[in-house]
Amino acid sequence: MFALTDKVIGNLQMATFAAFGGFATLVLSSFAGTRREKLAAHAALAVAGSVLLTIGTAVTSSTALAAIVTLPVTFAVFFAGIAGPNAASGSTGALLAYVLPAASPGTISMVPDRLAGWWLASIAGTAAVLALSPRPGEDRLRADASQLAAGLADLLDAALGGAATEARLGDAMAAKHELITRFTATPYRPTGLATPDEALANIVELLEWCTTLVADTIRERADLRNASRQERDLLEAAGSVLHDVATLLADGRTVPDLDRLERCRAESLAWLGQLTPERPGFRAAARLSFHADTIAGVVLATGAAALVARGLADPEWIATTRSRWHHGPATARLQRPRRRILSLAAVARRDASVRSVWFISSLRGAIALAAAVAVADLSSVQHGFWVVLGALSVLRTNAASTGSTALRALAGTAIGFVIGGALLVAIGSDSTALWVALPIAVFVAAYAPGTAPFAIGQAAFTVTIAVLFNLLAPVGWKVGVLRIEDVAIGCAVSVLAGILFWPRGLSSLVGDDLADTFRAGASYLTQAIEWASGSRTGEPDGGTATITAALRLDDALRAFLTEQGTKHIGKQELWRLVGGSMRLRLTAHLVAGLPRDATGMGAARDALSHRTGTLVAWYERLAELVGKPRGKPVADLEPPAFGPVDVVKVGSGSHYGIWLCEHLDHLSEGLDELVPPASRLAEIRRRPWWR
């Protein structure tokens, strides 16, 4: 396209935007999914780029106007990444269509030529992607989820047959770790806003928790041959559904029998209700019933999510499930386009907070780029575009990592200048040699990101630009010197923005979001226990807040783990804290869905209330530990201690109260493991940001 527009058509504006449009389409943006999904993503990039290009050209005549308009425009582009991985991956390419005209001289009359170049590059680039991209490989995330579901089903079958072993349990735990590692290996949540994507994300979370529940059951009672018929039937039905989920996720069409699992669960609860608390072995039976019912509840949700993920549930049921995840019953029967709009609006509301990594990163990026546009114009550099691109290329989530990246960017640019300058001196004015060198330079620049160090990518890009600009307007090696100067200015702007607006970056946000998840989960647990024990008249309504906090934490943690620089805290320590918050939230969710007993609790209600209060107070202290330091030293935190008043006694006469107490008892296990990583995070938050 560059050769066509430069040599055949002979239009400088068209050639420039064809060249950089190709970079935006093929180098800066990488879309995943099927060919249809890639086509839709590239089409959206082309349309968005056209709008941004027009706006950028319109504001370039005024420094103040360009800087002011850059703030909302770049914020909107960055923030649009909440829609999914492809939207996030296309943000830099879309911004290139804006910053190139906004930071370069031009008039509104140039818009048609620039759009023509942009669309030529978009069409050619999209065609190349669709024609030359390899066939989509196996969906490894779905495959890993299928493998874990099958492993859990086999483990339950083995326990029912008295053949559960530590080796089988170890295999299941290894499969869980592999699934979570793959799910968390990308900077963006590997699912979008579509209902099947949401369902797959839920499956990952549910299977992780189900693994913990099954492991706890096996470790407590590995041989279930002597369990009651009702509990055996329930666990056998749960294993059958897990087998069907595994087949379904592996492209099968088997529909899990959720109705049978529901019936077995109801029979198990009814059987437990017929037992008297004074009966020998009642507490052991109640504990096994708790394990079986908890596993069944999680497996039911997993089976439902699998049906949605594979598109086998009817639209009405999908809508109801979707509303339960994000909105509420009011949106259950809306038509699909409107549900899509409301879903986007709900996610936007969720992330419109200083607790959201999307909001804070978008705001910081917008301020840095607006400042870069203003500095580029006021400093009268020859190529202001490079100032803005320099700022964009080194933006990171904290000042220290931005500064580190800035140094690598300058080093890479200097290396590229030396190589490019030597190449131009050797080639001289031979345009044929430059045309031969251009595709080689482009190949290296496109291949380097993700496969070579950041500085190497910067060097390759500088060589490409040196060759490209000498084809457009021969100036020899001087273009390299100019780019070093401009990139240095842009890097300085990004570093300054990082110091002023977000010096600590994501480490502080991860702590704040962890605190929010623990507080929201503790509040939801209180509501759930009060509802199930009959002391609350209204149904629990804290579920939405816990989901919002969990999703914000997920986004912040992904960005933190993919951020360059020293972390000072291990990934496993962070995931132990995240797992603790998830266990709290899902326990509250499960209790909130249990039958309500408003009359038969008796003295058990006071014990449950006291035990819940002790747990909630501990989670509040944990949230305070990982939250904002507020000038306080790191406080010692001991696991909660429960006294006689916190235990529902067998003599209370309430089998349901004893059963609910098992939920709280299970949640209390392992809380001491959360203290060391929480204290470590608290210490990090109290260090100076530059350390």
Where in this protein do the model-derived segments appear?
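Active-site-adjacent mobile loop/cap segments within catalytic or ligand-binding domains
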Residues: 579
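Alpha-helical transmembrane segments and their membrane-interface boundaries
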Residues: 1-128, 132-133, 303-459, 465, ...
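Active-site acid/base region of carbohydrate-active enzymes
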Residues: 497
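Long, hydrophobic alpha-helical segments that serve as membrane-spanning/inserting helices
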Residues: 4, 8, 30-31, 132-370, ...
